[in-house]
Regions:
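Donor/substrate-binding cores of folate-linked one-carbon enzymes
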Residues: 1-117
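Generic recognition of long tandem-repeat/solenoid scaffolds
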Residues: 119-122
């Protein structure tokens, strides 16, 4: 499990643990993700574009940056008075802290499968 992990994982490790390493990203992927989007930069991007809804995404790690199969997402409303710091806190409290434990539980209980790059929960 990764959270705020800003180090590139070696490709061999990713291949060895395909669909077994998970990450959480503070946006609704595919928006505001990839190279350069981390920490407050994500929320600054959201606010500068006037986005109305953001959130968080738990996904499997692959060779790309925030490109792996999406496990769970949760939306959070963006408020007119938000600062990047306030939005970051709300995304953590209302989304990240909820969906990461849920994703771990689903995986630990064998309820997550990946077929053709898409996650199925059952």
């Amino acid at each position: 499990m990764l959270a705020g992990f800003l180090v590139v994982i070696p490709e061999q490790m990713i291949k060895e643990y395909t669909n077994r390493i998970i990450n959480i990203h503070p946006s609704l992927i595919p928006s505001f993700c990839g190279t350069g989007y981390y920490g407050l930069k994500v929320h600054e991007g959201v606010l500068s574009r006037g986005v109305k809804v953001t959130g968080a995404t738990v996904h499997f790690v692959d060779e790309g940056t925030d490109t792996g199969p999406i496990i769970l997402q949760k939306a959070v409303a963006v408020e007119e008075t938000d600062t990047p710091e306030a939005l970051q806190r709300r995304v953590m409290e209302q989304a990240e802290w909820i969906i990461m434990p849920k994703a771990i539980d689903l995986i630990a209980n064998g309820k997550v499968t990946v077929t053709d790059g898409k996650v199925h929960i059952g």
